[in-house]
């Protein structure tokens, strides 16, 4: 499996528990960080791009599927500052995390549980 696909599978697992840098990701794949960088560059991507894509996916999941406070989501995705998370969400979704959460919830169909 190409290294970029391996990372896309690994990063969500690692990021749910801690902030992940290139050294931690490389160690999990038993690679030297520089070797991983070279392999990713050969595929036309970077660790930073894959981590950003993973953060976007996890942010979307947390914002839509949970009521976790924004500061906690930001921290769990490795942001030390809520303002940086806000900027990332605006870049990804063209709106703030609160607006994205609100709009996503309004547009989701209500699922009714069967009555007993």
Regions found by a protein language model. Name each.
Residues 1-111, 116:
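Extended mid-to-C-terminal alpha-helical interaction segments
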